[in-house]
Swiss-Prot record:
Annotated organism of origin: Invertebrate iridescent virus 6 (IIV-6)
Key words, A-Z: Glycoprotein, Signal
Lineage, broadest ranks: Viruses, Varidnaviria, Bamfordvirae, Nucleocytoviricota, Megaviricetes
Top-level taxonomic group: Viruses
Signal peptide feature range: 1-16
Glycosylation sites: 37
Protein name: Uncharacterized protein 400R
Length: 43
């Protein structure tokens, strides 16, 4: 269980880093998708 939580934390960190990179580059189509994803994982 703890390992799964650890993997999820790393995954979320990588995802938010990818999101920041997306904002800087030209993948605006991906941005709303990631935002929805992030809000659903927060719940």
């Amino acid at each position: 269980m703890k390992l799964l939580n650890f993997i999820l934390i790393i995954f979320n960190a990588l995802k938010s880093r990818h999101l920041i990179r997306c904002l800087d580059s030209k993948c605006h189509k991906l941005f709303p998708l990631l935002e929805v994803n992030k809000s659903t994982t927060s719940l």
